[in-house]
Amino acid sequence: MEMYFKRMKDEWTGLVEQADPLIRAKAAEIALAHAHYLSIEFYRIVRIDPHAEEFLSNEQVERQLKSAMERWIINVLSAQVDDVERLIQIQHTVAEVHARIGIPVEIVEMGFRVLKKILYPVIFSSDYSAAEKLQVYHFSINSIDIAMEVMTRAFTFSDSSASKEDENYRIFSLLENAEEEKERQIASILSWEIDIIYKVLLDSDLGSSLPLSQADFGLWFNHKGRHYFSGIAEVGHISRLIQDFDGIFNQTMRNTRILNNRSLRVKFLLQIRNTVSQIITLLRELFEEVSRHEVGMDVLTKLLNRRFLPTIFKREIAHANRTGTPLSVLIIDVDKFKEINDTWGHNTGDEILRKVSFLSQKRLVKSKILGAGSSRKLAVS
């Protein structure tokens, strides 16, 4: 990514250096004179799109976005060589914000198209000569295109990182009590194994036993486990073990005489033992792999730490927009925390934080999310 930004800096610098200073001055003049009108017209057109409207409330547009758009137009069209590096950083920051709140890249691209469309008549209605108008337009469009490319590339990178964090949070939230889930599934497959062993040893018959894929463990693995652990190699190994043993199981069910033969019966029992043993080993490895996601948990309070706050807020904002419900965030600041630490020691301070976290969590309804914002702050969404 750094190499890309360096290349774009060179290209943007080259555009500014090669442009006639008079043309650059006229582009800056257009920007200063018309940025306010352009920002108003820009958001008027963009907000017609129903998809874009989801992200652009009237209050938000009036309070923040129009003035930000004005500054952006002036900065890009008035760029000097010394401004280029700062402008690239601005595009990167804007892209990160877009990715964090979930604005799709197609809306950003539509916005650039609208801006170039409304800029054209502004430039060509000026009193510049025809040649100057054309050069100002070319310089302005090329400047906007470079800014757009930098922003889009940074957006894609930020969106990819955000998606990974979304996936990490999904796994973390689904398997927050991973140890308990692991033991539950191990007990489930062992119970299935013991049930079959008893039937084979006592009756030489599988009776109404289900194949592994249809037993409780198999159903959990195929409908939940595969989804939770998608992308981890052990998932494929467990899937193949289940499939292979189901083949042996179904063959034995079709030919019950196999279990009347002692050597074949022993072979079948060894196969089930070997399969279950391998699956349990792989299952433990899966949960160990997932345990690394616990870096998303504050060690002291056992609450979500700041790592997942952008993911949580993005999800909550999307839900509030979709349902038209208000969204509030409560920040709880533990008062006199430094004084407590200095007077009674860090162990006492830690115990107070644990107590506050426990009581706060206990009093929250299940749909609310409590996270540790910093060493002394809790956030409730």
Swiss-Prot record:
Q: Does the keyword Coiled coil apply?
A: no
Pfam families, per database record: DosC_2nd, GGDEF, Protoglobin
- Any one biological process term the GO annotation gives: negative regulation of bacterial-type flagellum-dependent cell motility
Domain of life of the source: Bacteria
Keyword Transferase among record annotations: yes
Known EC number: 2.7.7.65
Q: How is the cofactor bound?
A: Binds 1 heme group per subunit.
Q: Where is this site: Transition state stabilizer?
A: 338
Q: Keywords for this entry? A: GTP-binding, Heme, Iron, Magnesium, Metal-binding, Nucleotide-binding, Transferase
PROSITE patterns per UniProt:
GGDEF
State which pathway it belongs to. Purine metabolism; 3',5'-cyclic di-GMP biosynthesis
Residues the record marks as site: Involved in oxygen binding and important for the stability of the Fe(II)-O(2) complex: 43
Q: What are its cofactors?
A: heme; Mg(2+)
List the catalysed reactions. Answer: 2 GTP = 3',3'-c-di-GMP + 2 diphosphate
**Mind telling me which GO cellular component terms the entry cites?**
plasma membrane
What does the domain comment read? Is composed of an N-terminal sensory globin-fold domain that binds heme and oxygen, and a C-terminal GGDEF diguanylate cyclase domain.
Instruction: Read off the PANTHER family from this record.
Output: DIGUANYLATE CYCLASE DGCM-RELATED, REGULATORY COMPONENTS OF SENSORY TRANSDUCTION SYSTEM
Q: What is the name attached to this protein's record? A: Diguanylate cyclase DosC
Q: Which organism is it from?
A: Shigella flexneri
**Which gene carries the instructions for this protein?**
dosC
